[in-house]
Every structure is written in structure tokens, then in C-alpha cells.
Curated annotation (Swiss-Prot):
Its EC number is 6.3.3.3. The active site is at 40. InterPro entries: DTB_synth_BioD, P-loop_NTPase. Pfam families: AAA_26. The lineage of its organism: Bacteria, Pseudomonadati, Pseudomonadota, Betaproteobacteria, Burkholderiales. GO terms for molecular function: ATP binding; dethiobiotin synthase activity; magnesium ion binding. Its cofactor is Mg(2+). This is ATP-dependent dethiobiotin synthetase BioD.
Length: 229
């Protein structure tokens, strides 16, 4: 039986490929013999016309996982409005709290050897007036995988995010580059700089893909450093 592995995936910003990277991790872990589950504890913006109330990120994680989970476990806080979660929750008349998320992770861990928990937006997105994604990561206590959206400005964003993770006593287990801007000048030089600056293994760089493809993305990700710790 594989040694248990769970992680919290965060990113340098929103729309930088966290879901694709999370799905790639799930695919790679399944290839290593793990029973996998993906959680999106908080999601804002539901799919119009879907047969059930869901979200695009949730569906990508569900497709990449090998363990099927009910929606209430996959995403304890699914909000309709595509905006910052604390604002979407306010519009829905609810307050995002930690206990349902902790319960969802516990339930997922009873069925899967590896759970990938994808955060929402960047590392310090407000979930309520007093609670943000950084506090969620601390409460869950999982090793963190940072997804760096490779575009102009990523060096500053990555350095600040890695610093914020370390300041909270969390272990940065690795980072994944995801090419957001295929025309970015000095792409390879930026990746080399990130490798020097970020005190964690570089798990790989996902190129700009024509469409999200977890299996193809996984071919660019090396999970060995994650499983060796």
C-alpha cells in the first residue's frame, strides 16, 4: 500500500492553472498506485445548464480522481456568484466556516490514499471577514504545493507567496510552473530564477496547452520529490 500523501495546492494568483496542476498531481499519483481524491473546499461560480449544481474546477478534479465523492464532500462551500468567495457567500446569505471543510477532508481520507486539496485564488483570498485561504491551509496542516503562473510579474508573486507560506509555519513541498503566457520573454530564465529563489523542489513546468488535459500535464510533473518526504 502506498504511503499516505495529502497536499494543499495554492497559487500565485487566480486563473494561473491551479486546477490543471491539481488534476495533473491526481493523475500522477494514480499512476503511482494511489487511490486519489480531489477536494475544492470553496468554489465561486457555478456552471449554467449543468444537470447538477457544480463548478468547472470541481469537474476537472472529479475527472482526474480515482475515488468518487459526493458533491458535499468534493466542495463543502459551492457558491453561485463568480466573485471573491467572501462576497459570493455574503450574496448567498451564508458564512464560510472551517468545520465542514475539515469534515470533508476526513471523509475523503477514509476512501483515498492521496487527497489533493485545491485552494481558491491566491494564498490570501478572503473566505469571510475574518478568515482567509492562508488560515485554511494552516488549519488543515498539509504540505503545500505552489503553482506559479508563468507570466510577467511571476517572480515577485512567487517570492511573496513562498514567503507567506513559510511565515505561517507551513512546509512548501514543491512548486509547479504553469505557462500562462506562451510569448513571455525570458521564460526559461524566469524558471531558472524561480529555481534559485524558491526553497523547495521544482516539480516541473506545464507548457501552454490548447485545452486542459490532466494526463498531458502530468507528463510534465515529477511527484517523486513529494513522495520522498
Amino acid at each position: 500500500m502506498p504511503v499516505r500523501f495529502d497536499c494543499f495546492v495554492t497559487g500565485t494568483d487566480t486563473e494561473i492553472g491551479k486546477t490543471l496542476a491539481s488534476a495533473a498531481l491526481l493523475t500522477a499519483l494514480a499512476g503511482a498506485g494511489y487511490r486519489t481524491a480531489g477536494l475544492k473546499p470553496v468554489a465561486a461560480g457555478t456552471l449554467a445548464g449543468a444537470p447538477e449544481r457544480t463548478n468547472e474546477d470541481i469537474e476537472q478534479l472529479r475527472a482526474a480522481a480515482t475515488v468518487g465523492l459526493p458533491m458535499a464532500t468534493l466542495c463543502p462551500w459551492l457558491l453561485d456568484a463568480p466573485m471573491s468567495p467572501h462576497l459570493a457567500a455574503r450574496r448567498a446569505g451564508v458564512t464560510i466556516t472551517l468545520p465542514p471543510i475539515v469534515d470533508a477532508l476526513a471523509q475523503a481520507r477514509t476512501q483515498a490514499d492521496a487527497v489533493v486539496v485545491e485552494g481558491v485564488g491566491g494564498f490570501r483570498v478572503p473566505l469571510s471577514d475574518t478568515f482567509d485561504t492562508a488560515q485554511l491551509a494552516v488549519a488543515l496542516g498539509l504540505p503545500v504545493v505552489l503553482v506559479v503562473g508563468l507570466r510577467l510579474g511571476c517572480l515577485n508573486h512567487a517570492a511573496l507567496t513562498a514567503e507567506a507560506i513559510a511565515a505561517r509555519g507551513l512546509r512548501l513541498a514543491g512548486w509547479i510552473g504553469n505557462v500562462v503566457d506562451a510569448t513571455m520573454a525570458g521564460l526559461d530564465d524566469n524558471v531558472a530564477t524561480l529555481r534559485r529563489w524558491i526553497d523547495a523542489p521544482h516539480l516541473g513546468t506545464i507548457p501552454r496547452l490548447p485545452r486542459p488535459d490532466a494526463r498531458l500535464a502530468a507528463s510534465h510533473v515529477d511527484i517523486a520529490p513529494l513522495l520522498a518526504r
